[in-house]
């Protein structure tokens, strides 16, 4: 069975925080001499180099993956200054492999995705592969093409989940960790296989408002027109703001009123934040929207936002209950990784502790760690996740791993 040790620290100094998190995680392991993977998240103001050096010194050759984000999630609380770490010992017959692709905004996205898949698959010949976990240090241009390249080698229906840890225009850039290295403008991933099973869930809690609209002209993540009118008129119509006030307030307003993209065959709308308005009335979004898409303005309350948490966790647990590993009656253990959009943090604000309470109540005794993100990566389909992988905004996603 999986040996799981999770540790947390909010020490001010990066080195001391990393040391404390490691010792606490080791204390929670049954066998601290056999560690097969380390997974780490820390808040972005820490020195990434200091953390990496500490991990290298104290964990030597243990494969390490993770990154820094705007806030971390632990069983102790939600912290804008902290580090949370999971140390994992695998059961016999379970495997993983880590890899990264770099300079992804300077290279062809499809090629980068394909390169990462090739690296991840190295050493996985004749081993059943089950799941990919991916981290981007920031939102990338050409995200759908990156996924297409990844799936070219992993398979069109291979399940992946992950996160972008900072936004495209963030001044406080995030960093990724892979083994003893620190880097950005990259994607790091881990592929799991063998006697490991998983369940994933993703929900957001936003509901459609008003009638459907047609995206009539786009270029990448920029919507030029909706219903053959300047795209900004969508918000002018529903929110009754004059153009000047709307332009100043839209980034904040779009947290409460994102754009929902209808995906044929899916129950959930795919959310897109609007980050700015161009002078000509085009909307700049946090993620691409294909031309010809049907969209609706979306609305949420704190209550529906929080209700998405147990829904996502229930979805993940439902798949675990039907897994072959579970049906074998083998003695297993499990842990959870949670990703929550920073937009949810900003919406909940003083009620952010409620998000943690919902997570703890819904997961029960399952240990967990997580991070706030600027974008999530997951399929939409509930049934075995055998569908297209999408970049999401404003979602809560959970991955439960059992072995």
State where each predicted segment sits.
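Small-residue-enriched flexible segments
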Residues: 1-37, 41-58, 62-63, 67-71, ...
